[in-house]
Design a protein with these regions (language model features):
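Single, function-defining residue in the core of a domain
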Residues: 1-106, 114-121, 126-456
Length: 456
């Protein structure tokens, strides 16, 4: 879908929202369209008229407009889009949203070791189709706030039942996802980091026949042999090496490294006498003992080198959920900059922007992904948009065919004053959207100039 066709996108995502009145649904679609068109800007700055501004604020203040109803429409749209893909990765991760605005902070909970910080905890699940490198959409998202009175009382949390702990979020996400996807769930592989290495969660996934790849955090006991899980690599089946692209993060530079893969079936046991868990264990590590090492647990059967490498490739895609949270929180949708008067109003906007952020991520990812960067840029830019961008950035005669997505992504970033100082070829969120806004100003100027050719 062309990026500037925001209304079609918004109608596809939110057009089925059940808000008790069709006029509210239409207003939601209009608001989402404006927020997508001017990603990162406020309601006032993104709306096209004062009537739109007033309508948007009435919608956000309406107690009959439930955040879950807004999200439900988006999840339904994602489930509908998922039906056409033979394999899907459910990329999961948690984050916190930090809101410093004084009017709403008292309704929020603690989020960090800083007792003054206030916000929401969030657990998100993105569906991604690895076969075509396509971002399908957001299929699940939970929001909650920690009680301020429980700050610093970790020992009390350990005594709670599993269903009342934050760690239950992983199983809860799988339950919700299975309800929404139905038969499609059998094509889904959940991909989670070390926080999901929870006995109850692994047991649940296996008992429900759900597929997963989880990075192990705990050096668990083995049922069929003495010793523990992390001492197994010397006795595993070798599966060759794999080139891993380590993305730039914080002060860590982007790099490529050779990872050596080995695998075997394992049975993990618990000291309490519960039945062991039968899984496949894959070890992926650098030759340097101090280098990176992934201990992966999966429900998938691995019988050869190709299958082992495929599992490692699935886990590599997990970083996309971290990129999604960046697109949502800071560089793209800038959800943490919201200034709403109540928590309910805040959650309505947070929910809408959660889906806008998926759209932001999909644009950047298609432009930098090796699988899609050579596709035509007309999948995201209209002919007028890419031609104006070409004239502005290249200053040459227009090519006979549209340039690739990689060119479009980098050209938008350069228009936003991006300089590839780290030599990664991966522009950040802010420069892409600065470039996008400048391009839209160019398009508007071009159309106004064209209109002068008509009689007034």
């Amino acid at each position: 879908m062309v990026l500037s066709d925001c209304y079609s996108w918004a109608n596809d995502i939110f057009g089925s929202a059940e808000l008790g009145d069709l006029r509210r649904t239409r207003r939601l679609v209009t608001l989402a369209s404006s927020l997508a068109q001017y990603t990162g800007l406020s309601i006032v700055k993104s709306s096209r008229s004062s009537a739109e501004v007033e309508g948007a604020y009435r919608l956000m203040r309406n107690p009959a407009v439930l955040p879950d109803a807004i999200a439900g429409a988006g999840f339904t749209a994602t489930a509908r889009a998922a039906a056409e893909h033979p394999l899907l990765l459910a990329l999961e991760d948690s984050t916190s949203l930090n809101f410093s605005h004084s009017t709403v902070r008292e309704e929020l909970g603690s989020i960090t070791n800083n007792q003054r910080a206030r916000g929401l905890q969030v657990h998100s699940v993105l569906l991604y189709a690895p076969g075509c490198a396509h971002m399908v959409g957001l299929i699940e998202q939970q929001r909650w706030s920690r009680e301020y009175d429980s700050y610093g009382k970790k020992h009390q949390r350990k005594q709670r039942p599993y269903e009342e702990k934050e760690s239950y979020k992983w199983q809860k996400a799988s339950e919700h996802m299975a309800q929404r996807l139905g038969e499609i769930q059998s094509r889904v592989i959940s991909v989670c980091d070390r926080e999901a290495d929870i006995w109850h969660y692994l047991d649940y996934k296996l008992s429900q026949g759900q597929r997963f790849v989880v990075r192990a955090a705990q050096n668990r006991l083995l049922a069929e042999a003495p010793g523990k899980l992390f001492s197994l690599p010397e006795h595993l089946t070798e599966a060759g090496s794999h080139t891993l692209n380590v993305v730039q993060k914080g002060g860590r530079a982007a790099r490529q490294t050779q990872m050596f893969i080995s695998y075997n079936n394992v049975q993990l046991k618990k000291t309490t006498g519960e039945a062991p868990l039968s899984l496949t264990y894959i070890c992926c590590r650098e030759a340097d003992p101090e280098g990176a090492c992934w201990h992966l647990l999966t429900s998938e059967k691995v019988e050869n080198t190709e299958q082992a490498r495929a599992i490692v490739g699935y886990y590599e895609r997990r970083w996309l959920i971290e990129e999604y949270h960046k697109a949502w929180k800071s560089g793209g949708a800038q959800v943490e900059q919201l200034r709403m008067q109540t928590r309910d109003n805040l959650e309505r906007m947070v929910t809408i922007l959660a889906f806008v952020a998926v759209r932001v991520l999909a644009l950047r990812q298609r432009g930098v992904s090796e699988e899609t960067q050579n596709e035509s840029c007309e999948s995201v830019l209209s002919p007028v948009e890419w031609k104006l961008l070409w004239v502005k950035q290249e200053g040459k005669t227009l090519p006979e065919s549209p340039p690739p997505l990689k060119w479009a992504c980098q050209s938008l970033a350069k228009l936003g004053r991006w300089y590839d100082s780290k030599r990664t070829g991966r522009p950040g969120w802010i420069v892409i959207w600065d470039g996008w806004f400048k391009l839209q100003d160019m398009v508007e100027g071009y159309r106004m100039a064209k209109s002068l050719d008509q009689e007034i």
